[in-house]
């Protein structure tokens, strides 16, 4: 196939998370997928180590999901879920999700189209709940620095990433941020993980007390911070946080958008870290990314109040045209069926040890500060002198260079600043894992050489 060049330069999309100057460059246009690989319009093959955007867990050619979509399209391509009208796939999926999530008993499911919409909905539910209880002042939401919760007005405000706030008048005044629980980056000299967790928990409680517990409605957290760089909770962190939330009658929203459905080696991140949330957001792997769908799981404590209040005022007036879209629900049902049939957590645990150990073997590199991860999620953080306090100059774009070298050798990663995320599909074979580790090593060697050159130029 002849190379297709320049055709899409200056294209018509206002592309997400992309700078304006990039539209003057040829975009990477992906044309097809097969298993753990994607192919661009020139036929070049890439090992997709981020599962698209943390979502294509079953790879790019799971025929059962395609067949589920086709069957539903030929039966009922669309119907809504307003006014007590709905479809069987949405009812079946709601039941299946309630059965699957066992960390804390959930009672109702509300469908959205993305994790962003799910987290946006969570805040509306929390407000509705407190208004119904006669606590209109209890509205503030606490999120964490570096967290990613989505891109809608509310979910972007919850996200603790300053670039997502710039020029958007975010975060809104009802959103508060507490510290990121990244032990390697932020612990004090001599401080153990548990002592670090205690300090962060105490600071969280101080924030609550300073604001007034009667004004704080909920705390939202990813079990493992994904986009921030696969930041694992330090020892006893969630135990301490949950005790404080219970003490002050503050709801816990678990954002399982990245962690849910096996990514960490447990069905949900809440299972791994003994989190007992009041509300849960799921998306991404819910359909293995084959259809846009997300869901909000609501505990009995909250759903009973919402339903009772809706009877008083006439209706629960929140929803989307595509809430519970029958095709998306049919695909999600089939994905969940596959996870159960294939014992997907066992699959992840079988391959994740080699994935984690194979990449962490590069941790001695002079340009790597930390390689961290669990299950099939891992992040590499590039720093100078192996210190979190010694980042490379921004203009060196070390992480971006590493990502470009990976692409050159036929592998796609996510490069954000100087950390690089990987979350491969669960279909990854041992041979493909060997290829992943090999390309990582080649790209790292190139990047080390590049950093040496930049340092010599700086002298």
UniProtKB/Swiss-Prot annotation:
Catalytic activity reported: vanillin + L-alanine = vanillylamine + pyruvate
Binding site for pyridoxal 5'-phosphate: 115-116, 255, 320-321
EC assignment: 2.6.1.119
GO BP annotation list: alkaloid biosynthetic process; biotin biosynthetic process; gamma-aminobutyric acid metabolic process
Gene Ontology terms, MF aspect: adenosylmethionine-8-amino-7-oxononanoate transaminase activity; pyridoxal phosphate binding; transaminase activity
Keywords tagged on the record: Aminotransferase, Coiled coil, Pyridoxal phosphate, Transferase
Coiled-coil stretches: 428-459
Transmembrane segments: none
Pfam families documented for this protein: Aminotran_3 (PF00202)
SUPFAM superfamilies: PLP-dependent transferases
Superkingdom of the source species: Eukaryota
Modified residues (N6-(pyridoxal phosphate)lysine): 284
Tissue specificity comment: Expressed in placental tissue of immature fruit.
Family from the record: Belongs to the class-III pyridoxal-phosphate-dependent aminotransferase family.
Function: Involved in the biosynthesis of capsaicinoids natural products, pungent alkaloids synthesized from phenylpropanoid intermediates in the placental tissue of chili pepper fruit acting as repellant on herbivorous mammals and conferring spiciness to hot peppers. Can transfer an amine from alanine to vanillin, forming vanillylamine and pyruvate.
Entries under PANTHER family matching the protein: ADENOSYLMETHIONINE-8-AMINO-7-OXONONANOATE AMINOTRANSFERASE (PTHR42684), GAMMA AMINOBUTYRATE TRANSAMINASE 2 (PTHR42684:SF10)
Name of the protein this chain belongs to: Vanillin aminotransferase
Source species of the chain: Capsicum frutescens (Cayenne pepper)
Lineage of source species: Eukaryota, Viridiplantae, Streptophyta, Embryophyta, Tracheophyta
Annotated gene: PAMT
